[in-house]
Each structure stands twice: as C-alpha cells, then as structure tokens.
C-alpha cells in the first residue's frame, strides 16, 4: 500500500504537467496555430504553422564556434535555463533552433530547461511568464542555484554561444 501511495505521489504531478504541455491557441493576427504555455521541442511538430520547418532548417545549418563551445561546456554545471519564446516570432524561429543546437552539442540536460511559449501580448496563462518581466522574445534566462545570472533578449550581441559563455562566467 505504501508503494502505491509513493508512486501516486510522484507520478500525479508529472502526469498533470505533461497534460498541460504544448497547448495550442490561435494567433489572432495571422489566424495560425501557436503554442502557448509550457512547451518542449516536440510541440514544434504539432502546430499548423511554419515554425517546425523553420526550426529544422536553422538547426541543420547552424555551426557552433568550437573554441567557445569548449569554454561553455565547463560552465554549465548547476545551470538552469528558462526560455520564453513564441512560435509566431521570427527571432524565435532563428535563435531557438540555434540554442537547441548549442545545448544538444553540449549534452545539456533538457530537464533543466523550462520553455514557455507566449502570445503576442507576451502572456501565457498558467505559467510563471508574468513574473519574468519579458518584453521581447525570445528571452533566454540563465540561473545558478535559483539566482538569475543574466539574459539574452531577442538577439544576442555576438554569437549565441559566446553570449551564454559571458553570462555563465559571472
């Protein structure tokens, strides 16, 4: 009986969270589907828009800077990332696949990544988005021990991996 209670206590939140993952809404401006709320990469394939094809194309062609990647790999320990993005956003279509490419090459644990897709008002009901003070997307927020280290807002100032390295060097 204790085992059943223990498994229920562990599995129920995971099931509840997964049911709210990759929710869809209609983008009123373009009348397209968009993701809203907590999402993951699998959600990109589920919406009726060009986000997934743009994502796949950008992911495929992006080449990381190897010297920077070596430095960055040493700085990822204990890092969590929150990504606020929008599937309707051109900058998200460009920078989110590059971010995933960087993290994939570094074998980043994607359980330490929270992705929130917002609408055109930068809102995502049922998420922490309102408390993050995000005005532009994508916004990449980097944390270590629940302390925000820095953000990349909309477009990096240099190569994305270089900006991440600078933030994680703090």
Q: For the regions a protein language model found, what residue spans apply to each?
A:
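Short, surface-exposed basic-aromatic patches at helix termini and helix-loop junctions that form
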Residues: 101-107, 130-134
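Bacterial Sec-dependent N-terminal signal peptides
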Residues: 1-23
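Non-globular targeting/processing and membrane-anchoring segments
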Residues: 17-75, 165-170
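Thiol-based oxidoreductase modules, predominantly thioredoxin-like and allied folds used
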Residues: 81-87, 110-124
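Short Fe-S-cluster ligation motifs
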Residues: 121-135
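Generic recognition of short, well-ordered alpha-helical segments
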Residues: 94-97, 127, 162
């Amino acid at each position: 009986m204790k085992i059943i209670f223990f498994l229920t206590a562990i599995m129920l939140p995971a099931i509840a969270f997964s049911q709210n993952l990759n929710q869809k809404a209609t983008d009123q401006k373009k009348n397209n589907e968009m993701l809203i709320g907590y999402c993951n990469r699998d959600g990109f394939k589920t919406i009726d828009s060009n986000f997934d094809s743009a994502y796949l194309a950008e992911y495929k062609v992006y080449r990381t800077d190897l010297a920077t990647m070596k430095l960055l790999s040493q700085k990822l320990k204990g890092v969590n990332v929150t990504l606020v993005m929008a599937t309707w956003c051109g900058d998200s279509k460009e920078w989110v696949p590059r971010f995933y490419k960087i993290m994939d090459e570094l074998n980043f644990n994607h359980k330490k990544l929270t992705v929130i897709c917002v609408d055109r008002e930068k809102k995502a009901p049922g998420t922490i988005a309102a408390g993050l003070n995000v005005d532009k997307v994508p916004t990449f927020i980097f944390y270590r021990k629940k302390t925000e280290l820095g953000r990349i807002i909309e477009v990096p100032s240099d190569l994305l991996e270089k900006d991440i390295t600078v933030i994680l060097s703090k």
